[in-house]
Amino acid sequence: GVATAIATGGPGAIFWMWIAAFFGMATIFSEAVLAQLYRTRDAHGHLTGGPAYYISQGLGSKTLAAFFSVAIIIALGFVGNMVQANSIAGAFYTAFNVPTWVTGIFTFIIAGFIFIGGIRRIASFAEKMVPIMALIYVIGSLTIIFTNLEGVMHALEMIFVGAFDPMAATGGVIGAGIKEAIRYGVARGLFSNEAGMGSTPHAHAVARVKHPAEQGLAAIIGLFIDTFIVVNMTAFVILCTGALDGTTTGIALTQKAFTLGLGTIGNGFVAVCLLFFAFTTIVGWYFFAEQNVKYLVGVRYVSIYRVLVLAFIMAGSFLHVTLVWELADLFNGLMAIPNIIALIGLSKVVGRALEDYEKKFLAGETPE
């Protein structure tokens, strides 16, 4: 997302991504608290929850809850997973010249295996590998940044100048105005940290904590790490290496930057890291959306949903990156609207939970 934001909105998009993330901390805190407060158990006794539950139970609007469920099924289950498949296919084509249809079939098969029943095995593997890959990615990024320290101040200048005058920041390389900088910064920031979208509450609902506000604080920490550490590293690698050329976009821009910074291994480095990150995202988004399929129509249509997701994953491998991102922006917005309405309507509920947590914490008690 960050590479696309820079390529389409200029370096200034990063500034607006920071602004969106700053305000998103309050948003994601509220989402996590409400997910905890309005969670329930399914027919098998498993914890479940999310915006559909706090919209229907908290606001008392089953219509708005149904609208959200339909929107998230399309936004994450279908379009969102197209984005991930598109990124994987693009990365492996750039790095290893693997045809997109080959990567598409590979992604289709592995995703199908996961959805049908291999989730525990893959989840166990991902649990071990993703933190390792994240650490390797951070080390690779820091290596490039520290070997290009002279470019850090210039990168900061490009970000702050570009936030209000994108043409001046890039010398006209990126033909974007302030509207594009704000739009793509906020949109890609939303896609990256998911604050306000209504996706992460499904994960927060099943977390076992002593107090709802405790999960809210954990959500804030997660957002901070995602946007202000990982995303910033990618942004500074792109800007410090001078990879921005006005024509390269998406994952190809990130790969170009890492190749300039690490040499020929940069392409493959990004492709392999992305494979792990994108697959865990596909799994997570599939199950977030599946919860809403069950909320709407029960388990009888889950198989149909599963087949459709696999079809969209395959299609995502072939489509042009710009079209995929435009579709993602549209449906992410539709998903966020009912969720934000609920966050505003239930703000007093969140406030009371936070007040209770603070009162107990300051009194030396264990908040629960």
What positions do the PLM features span?
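Transmembrane helix-boundary motif of multi-pass solute transporters/channels
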Residues: 1-20, 200, 205-207, 214-215, ...
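Transmembrane helix-loop junctions in multi-pass membrane proteins
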Residues: 1-5, 11, 78-89, 113-125, ...
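Flexible loop linkers connecting adjacent transmembrane helices
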Residues: 2-14, 18, 28-59, 244-261, ...
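Extracellular loop-to-transmembrane helix junctions
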Residues: 6-46, 225-233, 267, 329-342
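Helix-loop-helix module between adjacent transmembrane segments
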Residues: 23-45, 51-115, 272-282
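Extracellular/periplasmic helix-exit of transmembrane alpha-helices
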Residues: 29-37, 140-158, 166-173, 205-209, ...
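Membrane-interface loop-to-helix entry segments
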Residues: 86-92, 98-160, 293, 298, ...
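A generic transmembrane alpha-helix motif of multi-pass inner-membrane proteins
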Residues: 180, 301-355, 366-368
